[in-house]
Amino acid sequence: ADFGFPGIEIEGERITMRSWSETRESTRVFNESADALHAALEEVRQRGIRHVVLLGDYTDDGQRVTTETLKGILERHRDTHGTAFYALPGNHDIFGPCGRNHTKEFLTENGKGVLVSSDARRTGEGVVITDRMYCEGYPAGLDPMGAFGYFRQPDYLHWETPFGASDAPEDRLYDVRSPDGRNVYRLMDASYLVEPEEGLWLLMIDANIFEPLDG
């Protein structure tokens, strides 16, 4: 993904890379994830798999540009090979009703770190501010991946949500309250049931839970 800073360039291709010190402290793989995805999609092609389920955490941390980049990769694979994808959001793909800022450190071509943030309040020499780093909330965070199950598609034989047949976000809302009852938020449930071809049913349950804090 391109976050708008001078990163590492190899053979004319820009690479967004995290440091080893950050990678080793995480349970996730940062720098190898793109190659792993392309390798998995190539195996999908070779095996003739027609339907692929993405069970959450399909982005790094839901950054706008990361989600858009993934969308492009899946669209190209779908259009070229006819593979259908069905997504569910993980806790790293979307956050609550309004989203949240992210700040990450990346490597520059000289091996030094640069902070990239969506939070305009972050100041300091060398800090790159960009809204590409922002993680969207419901339903905006679903829109880029909307064609991958979240919303009804013309070729589906059947599609519905726990709230009925409408795929409109305003028809898929529910209230959540803080334990003291003082804070109430309206959230969208991204769950859906789809029959993409006769006899194949996929029950996709949005397991994200966002609990308002007291006060």
Per-region residue spans from a language model:
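N-terminal active-site segment of His-dependent metallophosphoesterases
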Residues: A1-T67
